[in-house]
Amino acid sequence: MDAGLSTMATRNGQSSARVKLRNNLLNNDIGNIDIRDETPISRNGNDSNINIQPSSVPQQQQQQQQYYRNGMNEAPIQAPLQQRQIPMQNYSQQQRQQQQYNFEYSNPHMNEIPLMQHNFTKPSLSNNRDNVNGKKASSFTQSSFSNFFKHKHQFGKSKKNTKGTGGGGDGDDDDEVILDDSANSDLTFNDIQTFGHKGGDKYGYGGDSTPIIPTLVTKDRGNMSNTEYRKYITNQRKTAMNAMAKQTKNGTLASLPPRAMSLQSFPNGNPLMQAPTPHPRFQPNKMVSANYSRSNSLMSGPPGQFRQPQQQRMLPMNNYNNHPGQFQNTPPVMPSGQQPPQQPRTLSLTNGPRYSPQNPRPFAGHQQISQRQQQQQQQLQLHPMSEGYRTMSLQSQNVPQGFNPWSPNDNDRKAVSMKQPISQSSISSKNNSAYSIPNVQNNSLTTFSPSSPTDATAMPNSTKQGSSPLKKQVNIDQPIENKGKLNVLQLSTPQQNELKEKERKLAEMEKSLREREALVEEKEKERAEKNTEANEEEEISHESDDLNLRPASALETGLKDLKLESESAVANRASLSTFSSTFSDSPSKQRIINTRTGMYKLENSTDINEYVTAQEFPSPGKYNSNSDNGEMNTTNEVDFDFNTSKRASLLQSIPERDPKRNVSDATIKRRESDGNGRRLSNVNISMNQENINNDTFLYKKNNRDGHLSAVSHMSSSSRRSFISNTLPLNIDSASESDNFVPHMDGSPSKTKSAPVSYDKDGMNASEEDFSFDNTLAKPYEPLYARRGDITSAGSTSGEDSSQPKMITISGEQLNLITENKELMNELTLVSTELAESIKRETELEERIRLYETNNSAPSFDDSSSVSFSDFEKELRKKSSKIVQLIQQLNDERLKRFIAEEQLLLQENGTKPSSMELVGRIENLNKLIDERDSEIEMLKGRLQ
């Protein structure tokens, strides 16, 4: 900068004055400039008539100012002149001007201008005028340099100077400021805390209380707060709006579109943004109109800049029927090739004529114009007119009615394609919804009634011009040979055929869906009929069966959780706390054989000591009946075929309880061969000596005492009554095997039938783990009901009769049923263990007795032996009575569970009603009576 000033000083020959001025500027902020000595600039002056001062110093200072500004990457600025006299109340503004001057003319050796680096000393009130007069300086240019800091925040520059109009402008320069995003015009909220009291009083405590409200931030926008950003954007928008208004007012630039409901007097739209037109040779004489404002505008017509002499020619009026009120305001003709302007929108209140551009298709190519369009263009040359106003227009002039060159004539009405027509609601400009093709189906007679160019009294009537209602809308107010046609759209023949094809496909699809629905209904009916027939056949086949109210006995329920397909299978219990292995070769079993008790203790993480007595079941036919040596041998039979075997549990039965259960082995085998529909395994307990220590029943030490605690609390009198009413056990092998195997095949000789008729799915359903979700519905398969009872009521649902209907119950109910089943399993297990212990005890006593008879030297006294034997007999009687009571308790509890399940099935619609059940019971009782009578008759004949 110093080198440049030195060079300039040498060239002009005024080095001392420039150096002095430069030093004054650097030392005293604005030097000795006094704005009172400035020469006023003419208001109407421009670059050519600026008053030149006699002295050449201001020109040099102007060059120096431009040099300073260009050194800081800013354009040279020329500000208009400020007033000559500065009153005392403007001291604060002058002080801020000096501060901003310090910002922009600080150390010239710095690349960037630091912010707020100067101390602002505020002079006292008595020295205000001296300070003001001392800080005035002569002008650098013909415009006042202090006028550059005229505005409050000094962020703008005169736009008139930017345009090159010189320093002369009007006095309304406050509105002609645009933003200058330079690096030197930063004043943010962060500057307030260090702005007001450097070297002086704190802000608000001194004589100057001028508010400092920073509203502009021109850089570092990433660190703005939301308040700063909003103020910045608001001020920027206001400044831009004022600049645009000034430009429009002065007429220097083209007008921009105002907002709707505007009361301004300048037009809407940019003349440069107009719709495209076809080739100019087809449009030698086109009608044009100026751009109009938007809806609800109160403008008074087209602007003056569009009313040029070559556009003021009016076309002749007598070329087309000369109807009254027609062509009263004929638009001026634009030169060939000039693009037409836009049309106003709906509900316009303007009173000037509106005309649409007369191009056949604005969005069509130049090479795609047909013969019909060329003929229409020829007609336009002779009969030019507009397309008409938009709908619901309130213009105050007569609107031309009649001829629309773009509506097809009578011969070409059917040949109008979808690409050719232009409705009245569409216009030629992209800004006013050009390229929009209205839907033909929505353009009914009522749709075109408000949008037609005719009056309400001149509504077009229907004619016999075709089948479509759109073809009938012809204006009949004019002669037939020259009648005006509406701009009616209709689909082309290919598109009509396409629509018909789509309708036909939809009809075929609907028809196919209806046929498919009918077919599904027929299949459901057939399936329901088959289910009904199968249920009837099954009911007939099971007429001899009684209600399945026979409770599951101990061994059957205990073995329900065993899988006997392989010897290495592990028991699957429903409860994890009672999980234990039941075979001797299970990997989860600790193989420590106790020869005294014959039990294996399992390794588990629970506090309950679980024991198991395991027995390897021999296959059928491998058992031995050793009756010669007097040992009690019974049959252990397990049938692994679940489709051809019967599954029954073994619960000790006192011989005096039910004499009908003493059945021979031959009867047992015959019933096994007859039972093909049930999965009942006849398992007998082996009393062989080598299998005494290996039993097949799960045994809980802690639970055994709990189940029998009620018996231990019985009074002595009740015990004596039990003993007196109980006979000793029968140790006969054949009778014991019969007593421990109650058979449930539904024969009339038994009193109660077995409640178990499981298939493989039922067994898997009974082995489900405990569910922790009590809210979701879960499928339930009945445990005690027969398949025939389930499917008879659910046959109407369309399911297969071979599978029972699956019902869904809540998780809470399912868990309750599962716990009831587990409770029955535990009770039957305990009762079976007790029965087996009594049986083993009886067997040991018989063996001891046989040994004593064979031994010549008894080891105890006869009297003591007799008393001991009597005690043992009484103990056996007591034990047998306990077992009998436990069995009765289990039976009653199981009956309750069966009744609850029947009620649950009935509530879910899978069981017949109670009336049906009562009727079935009566029929079965009658059938039993008839068979009993037949048996009596046959016995009488045999005798």
Swiss-Prot record:
Coiled coil: none annotated. GO terms for biological process: endoplasmic reticulum polarization. The modification Phosphoserine is found at residues 553, 586, 619, 649, 681, 766, 771. Residues 152-162 have a biased composition (Basic residues). The modification N-acetylmethionine is found at residue 1. GO terms for cellular component: cellular bud neck; cytoplasm. Residues 41-58, 318-358, 397-409, 434-470, 622-639 have a biased composition (Polar residues). Residues 367-381, 417-433 have a biased composition (Low complexity). The keyword Phosphoprotein applies. Keywords: Acetylation, Phosphoprotein. The keyword Cell membrane does not apply. Residues 515-533, 655-677 have a biased composition (Basic and acidic residues). This is Uncharacterized protein YMR124W.
